[in-house]
Amino acid sequence: MAKKDYYEVLGVNRDASDEEIKKSYRKLAMKYHPDRNPDNPKAEESFKEAKEAYEVLSDEQKRAAYDQYGHAGVDPSAGPGPRQGFGNFADAFGDIFGDIFGGGGGNRRSNVYRGADLRYNMEISLEDAARRTETKIRIPVMSECETCHGSGARPGTQPVTCTTCGGHGQVRMQQGFFSVQQTCPKCHGSGKMVKEPCPSCQGAGRVKKHKTLSVKIPAGVDEGDRIRLSGEGERVNGGPPRDLYVVVHLKQHDIFQRDGGNLHCEMPISFTTAALGGEIEIPTLDGHAKMKIPPETQTGATFRLRGKGIKPLRTNDPGDLMCHVVVETPIKLTERQKELLREMEEINLQDSDKHSPRAKGWMDKVKDFFQ
């Protein structure tokens, strides 16, 4: 079956920006992740397709090669197999020029393949992001089959020479005037075939397992930051292990919104406090703090508490807490309260220029508009 177009897989246009590609991949990865769709092979296949497409389109060089040469520009094998990730452009097309200029080629590549880097999305609270902490995660990994030790063959048997490529790992294909050598679609470059599959892994050489890891979260991490766990990624065919990248996502906070090192919050105050001034108590990540409200404070006024934000990663100075005032209109008034407010309104109307200059100015503009 022919591979799907990577842009179609991610649902983006061919001129999509890096951010659009990243956003689309995140959405698909969350939707089709195997942990969210257990025992659903279609979802797992969609997840793999999205991951493969993103690995190419998020890399500038691979994307350029794909745009010019299609799938052959990034992965000549064009099919699933023990080789994960993608070779570079020179690997994919180096043999073409050897054929043209008499280099021949045809030697099988080394069988030591690297696996793929893994990604894990982790949600943490704003409080955990602000201070250094440690947590545990449980991740699915593809591990070498202990029964066949990664060969994919039934114990007591050995893989046999691939009948398609004769053990070379590559096949020659004619494309117009060019003779192109591509990775063998049958053995995926190994030069070997499994005649009797291992009963434990069905010939894949790997089995799905789960492992628990401890993740140290540095103080000041922000949305999208990555924590690298070296050697905790995939290991394929005895090759060196890749890495696991834990991607930080911040949970929505009930009070604060983060903007780099600064924190923002709404600060409702009564209209009497706004008019007369006073002192209120506000929450911070370190506890509570006192703030003085000057008389005649209006909705939209912002007060800054220096140093009460978050100290961003790799910086020494913490940000500030920005408190945005919202003057609250009283509700469910008693008759006595209504009476006092009407009395106050009568007094205000006697000198509205002084007591409500913005309202007076606005009404004057309205009158001028309709004249």
UniProtKB/Swiss-Prot annotation:
SUPFAM superfamilies: Chaperone J-domain (SSF46565), DnaJ/Hsp40 cysteine-rich domain (SSF57938), HSP40/DnaJ peptide-binding domain (SSF49493). CXXCXGXG motif repeats lie at residues 145-152, 162-169, 184-191, 198-205. GO terms for molecular function: ATP binding; heat shock protein binding; unfolded protein binding; zinc ion binding. Keywords: Chaperone, Cytoplasm, DNA replication, Metal-binding, Repeat, Stress response, Zinc, Zinc-finger. GO terms for biological process: chaperone cofactor-dependent protein refolding; DNA replication; protein refolding; response to heat. SMART domains: DnaJ (SM00271). Zn(2+) 2 binds at residues 162, 165, 184, 187. Its main location: cytoplasm. Residues 5-70 form the J domain. Zn(2+) 1 binds at residues 145, 148, 198, 201. It is found in: Cytoplasm. NCBIfam families: DnaJ_bact, PRK10767.1. This is Chaperone protein DnaJ. The lineage of its organism: Bacteria, Pseudomonadati, Pseudomonadota, Betaproteobacteria, Nitrosomonadales. The gene is dnaJ.
